[in-house]
Amino acid sequence: MFPMLQLLDLSDNALEGLVTENHFVNLKELVFFLASGNRLTLKVSPDWLPPFHLIDRLGLGSWHLGPQFPVWLQSLKEISEVDISNAGIKDEIPTWFWNFSSQISVIDLSHNQFSGPLPQISSSDITHLDLSNNFFSGDLIRFLCPPQNESRSMMKSLHLRRNGLSGQIPDCLSGSNWPNLRVLDMAENSLSGRIPKSIGLLNSLSFFDLDGNKLFGNIPPSIQNCTSLWKLDLGENEFEGNIASWLGSSLSSLVVLRLRSNKFHGELSPDFCHLTSLRILDLANNNFIGTIPKCINNLTSMVEQSKILIREIDLERVKLYEESAVVTTKGQEYQYFAIIFVLITSFDLSNNNFLGEIPMELTTLGELRSLNLSGNKLTGNIPKEIGNMKQLESIDLSRNHLSGEIPYSLSNLNFLSYLNLSYNNLSGKIPTGTQLQSFNASCYVGNNLCGPPLLGCSNDDDVPDEEEDRGDDFEAKWFYISMAIGFIVGWCGILGPLFAVKSWRYTFFSVYR
C-alpha cells in the first residue's frame, strides 16, 4: 500500500499502539516521516534495516524506542534531521551516531536518560543540537572548546538545559569556534563561577539562558557586544552589582530580560528605558532601591502593539520557535514559546526595595498584561489612570504602603482575572457593581477597606470619591431638570385657565393695562 509515498505526517495526534517493521514494508520511497507527538511503541528485530533508506527527515519524538539506542538509524545515510526525543532511551549514545550521515544537521535527543560526559562530536555540519533534560554530567571544557578537528562553525542552536553539568563556563567561546551560534541554553544545571568575558565574542547570539545555576559576579561588560540578543535569562543565580547603564543602550533589541532571584542592587538608570523592544521584564527578588523611573513610558513595545517580526531571526531554520520564556503571573509560573511570548507583556519588580509613588507614566503601558509591584515600599495612591491599561489580566500591588481609595477606573479592566491589593493602607469602600466583588476576600485583607467581598461599611454613604462624584453629578442634573419641569408646570397652571376661561382672561388683561 502506498509504494510511492514520499511524505507521511502523523504529528501530534496522540496515537497509541504498537508499530512493527511490517508497517513499513512498502514505504521504500519515504523521504519525510514526521510522527512526533504520539504515544506509539516501535517493536522491531535487532537487525532490522528500514526500507526507507533515502529518508531525509525522521520525527519519532514521544515514541517508545528504548531502552536501547535504536541502532537501525545507522543505515539511514541520507538523513538530515532526526528527532528521537522523549523516547525512553537509557543507553549511551554510540560514537558512530555523530558521523553516520554526512547530511545530518538537526538532532533532538532531549527528554531521555542519557548519562555520562557530554559526547565528542566529530561532525561539523550540525546546526541544531538538543541534549536537554537528560543526565549528562561533568564540565563543559571539552565540549565548548573543541579541538580543530571538531569544528562547531555551523552550530546555530545548542540546548544543554536541565542536566547535571558542573564546573565553570570556560573562557574559550569565540567567534571562530561558534560564529553562527544564536541559541545557547545551559539553564538548570550546577554551573558555578562567573560568566566569561569571551561571551561577548558570540556576535550572533539571540537567546542566552543561564537561569537556575550557581553563577555569581557581575554581568560582564563584554556582553554588550551581543547586540542581537532577544532574550537574556540569568534568573535564579547569585549575580550581584548594579545593572550597568550600557544595558539599555547596547542591548536595545532585548525582548525578554529576566534577572529575578539574584543579588542585584542599586537604582535603575534612566538608560534602562532605552529597551524599547522589551516585552517581558522580570527583576523580582533582588535588592533594587530608589524610585521606579518615570521614563518607563519609553518602553514602547509595552505601550503599543508589538511590531516584532518573528521572521527577522529566521525561526524555522534555527528552530527558534521552540525557545521559551518563563513568566511569573497570577501567582504562578507559565512557560511561553517564542511564537507566543512576543505577544506577552509582563512587568515584574516584586520583592525589592523600590519606594515612592507608582509613576503615572506606568499607566501608559497599554499593552501590559501582567503587573507585579508587590513586596516593595511604594507609597501614595493607586493611579486613577490605571483603568487605561485595558489589556491587564493580572495586578499584584500587595505588601506595600499604598494609601487612599481603590480607584473606580480599576473596574474598567474587563480582562482582569487576578488581583491582589492586600496588606497596604488602602481605605474606603471597594467599588461596587463590578467584577471587583468576584475576587476572593484575601485580595483585600490587611487594609481598611469595606464592602463586598469584605464586611459591609458602617456608613452606606462611605463610598469612593469617584462614585460620590458620579452620584453628585447625577443628582445635580435631576435638580435642574426638576426645576425646569416645575417652572413649566407652574406657568401652565397660571396661564392655562387664562386662555381657557374667557372672563378670567378679560379681567387679567384689563388689570395688566
PLM regions and their residue ranges:
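Terminal membrane/secretory targeting segments in land-plant proteins
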Residues: 454-513
